[in-house]
From Swiss-Prot:
Keywords: Chromosome, DNA damage, DNA repair, DNA replication, Nucleus, Transcription, Transcription regulation. Residues 190-205, 541-552 have a biased composition (Basic and acidic residues). This is FACT complex subunit POB3. Belongs to the SSRP1 family. PANTHER family: FACT COMPLEX SUBUNIT SSRP1 (PTHR45849:SF1). It holds the Pfam family Rttp106-like_middle. In contrast to the orthologous protein in animals and plants, this protein does not contain a HMG box DNA-binding domain. This function may instead be provided by the HMG box of the associated NHP6A/NHP6B proteins in the FACT complex of yeast. Present with 22400 molecules/cell in log phase SD medium. GO terms for biological process: chromatin organization; DNA repair; DNA-templated DNA replication; nucleosome organization; positive regulation of RNA polymerase II transcription preinitiation complex assembly; regulation of chromatin organization. Changing S489T: In pob3-1; causes severe defects in rate of growth. Changing R109C: In pob3-11; causes severe defects in rate of growth. It is found in: Nucleus; Chromosome.
């Protein structure tokens, strides 16, 4: 007879269910109350008795927590028990599986330092011998050595079976100071790859010679990083990759990375950082020739984006030499290829690198590859040079979207566009040779302006946008039309009101009268400096008093 518990949460899920302990193992099934699609789609969880390893009892988020360490399925967490359930669970596990349930007390001091223990299925952060928190390896998506003494851990939020309630932690960083010293002997070699035993190399048939030991320093952070990668088994082994591409140049995130493509994921291995993304994260694959006619770009739209600290990368931009070719053979068994990949992939490729990579990604992700469409610029290219804010780049008018490269990468589907405004960039002689293209989005979501596009491209670009049934508004043309209309109406009114005023023929003005002599004299007095003097001199000498002679 089995033992059942209701309202139990599996692995911090949103929904509760029924937990059952039976002789054959453990089971959990989500409650069907509510009838939601999410509830009905969740499959029951079953764990055979042979998978049980250790069981721990401790305080949890919703009461008491039962943590089960399995042999091959990681850590299973069941939360929502009451304190009274402990004795029943303890007796059941001992009677059915001969396993002791260990009571575990957590440290509640709230300190942010302690010691880490990389256990079988999880990383334990402990303080004074008591665990503060645990991180199951299955929840770790990636880890990077972010600096000399710092290790960053990114958590997996893409697991469809993992549906946590509320906010979700996406990254955690550990500061690990100090260094460790290891003795390295250049004349020593491992006896076997799987063994830690070392033996001296034989040089010229001599044995037992003195060997020189070199001391190598390694930071504690680097040692922790390497051990965590090994324990957590982050990413598949390189030998399991279906196909690999070496030293591929990325403009976003900038650097060179080795690309290992697996059945369900892709790993990018750089000198400093490594990234991992699932195939289902790839939303679009865009293959575009670069305007320099030397390189070719392959863009992957990622949702949710890759993260590196506070920086997110919603687009991965790969750059190849246009004529670079590669020859690869897929690492697949013939039976596996015939059964699962025959209609999607080729067994062997010998073509240009960007074509090979895009075809492989298309086959594994079931996403079509977007290529340039009908638009051609005046210089027979599929893009026009422009700028977005302070960044220069190229605008690709595709058949169903605007695409701007390279920084920042912008993708604007035509279905989101309300209208397109074409306006001049300025009024000076230099800026009048360019125009702005403002893309107004629907539902009042703002607009995006691409500036400094050559005037030579305006007519072709405008015709292309109209052919895609986009509403195009040319502000300059409307202003000119309004101005011409206004000027035309003014000239008509002047012709009507002025009559013959514009003629050059002279006519007599009847209101004009010739001034009299007195008026002329007054004018002369005003403007002729000699006028007053002449009047004074015009008088007789008799009226002028004679000057008395000087008497000596």
């Amino acid at each position: 007879m089995s033992t059942d518990f209701d309202r139990i949460y599996l692995n911090q899920s949103k929904f509760s269910g029924r937990f059952r302990i039976a002789d054959s193992g453990l089971g959990w099934k989500i409650s069907t109350s509510g009838g939601s699609a999410a509830n009905q789609a969740r499959k029951p969880f079953l764990l055979p008795a042979t998978e049980l390893s250790t069981v721990q009892w401790s305080r949890g988020c919703r009461g008491y927590d039962l943590k089960i360490n399995t042999k091959n399925q990681g850590v299973i967490q069941l939360d929502g028990f009451s304190q009274d359930d402990y004795n029943l669970i303890k007796n059941d596990f001992h009677r059915r599986f001969n396993i002791q349930v260990e009571q575990r007390e957590h440290s509640l001091r709230g300190w942010n330092w302690g010691k880490t223990d990389l256990a079988r299925n999880e990383m334990v952060f402990a303080l004074n011998g008591k665990p503060t928190f645990e991180i199951p390896y299955a929840r770790i998506n990636n880890t990077n050595l972010t600096s000399k003494n710092e290790v960053g851990i990114e958590f997996n939020i893409q697991d469809e079976e993992y549906q946590p309630a509320g906010d979700e932690l996406v990254e955690m960083r550990f500061y690990i100071p100090g260094v460790i010293q290891t003795n390295v002997d250049e004349n020593m070699t491992k006896k076997e790859e799987s063994s830690n035993e070392v033996v001296p190399k034989k040089e010229d048939g001599a044995e037992g010679e003195d060997v020189q030991m070199a001391v190598e320093e390694k930071s504690m952070a680097e040692a922790f990083y390497e051990e965590l990668k090994e324990k957590a088994d982050i990413g598949e082994v390189a030998g399991d990759a279906i196909v690999s591409f070496q030293d591929v140049f990325f403009t976003t995130p900038r650097g060179r990375y080795d690309i290992d493509i697996y059945k369900n994921s892709i790993r990018l291995r750089g000198k400093t950082y490594e990234y991992k993304l699932q195939h289902r994260q790839i939303q679009r694959i865009v293959s575009l020739p670069k305007a320099d006619d030397i390189h070719h770009l392959l863009v992957l739209a990622i949702e949710p984006p890759l993260r590196q600290g506070q920086t997110t990368y919603p687009f991965l931009v790969l750059q190849f030499q246009k004529d670079e070719e590669t020859e690869v053979q897929l690492n697949l068994e013939d039976e596996d290829y015939e059964e699962n990949y025959k209609d999607k992939l080729k067994k062997q490729y010998d073509a240009k690198t960007h074509i090979v990579l895009s075809h492989v990604l298309k086959g594994l992700t079931d996403r079509r590859v977007i290529v340039p469409g009908e638009y051609k610029s005046k210089y027979d290219q599929c893009a026009v040079s422009c700028s977005f804010k302070a960044n220069e780049g190229y605008l690709y008018p595709l058949d169903n979207a605007f695409f701007f490269l390279t920084k920042p990468t912008l993708y604007i589907p035509f279905s989101d566009v309300s209208m397109v405004n074409i306006s001049r960039a300025g009024q000076t002689s230099t800026s009048s040779r360019t125009f702005d293209l403002e893309v107004v989005l629907r539902s009042n979501r703002g607009s995006t302006t691409f500036a400094n596009i050559s005037k030579e491209e305006q007519q072709l670009l405008e015709q292309f946008l109209k052919s895609k049934n986009l509403r195009v508004k040319n502000e300059d043309r409307e202003v000119q039309e309004r101005l011409q209309t206004a000027l035309g109406s003014d000239s008509d009114e002047e012709d009507i009101n002025m009559g013959s005023a514009g003629e050059d023929d002279e006519s007599v003005d009847e209101d004009f009268q010739v001034s009299s002599d007195n008026d002329a004299d007054e004018v002369a007095e005003e403007f002729d400096s000699d006028a007053a003097l002449s009047d004074a001199e015009g008088g007789s000498d008799e009226e002028r008093p004679s000057k008395k002679p000087k008497v000596e």
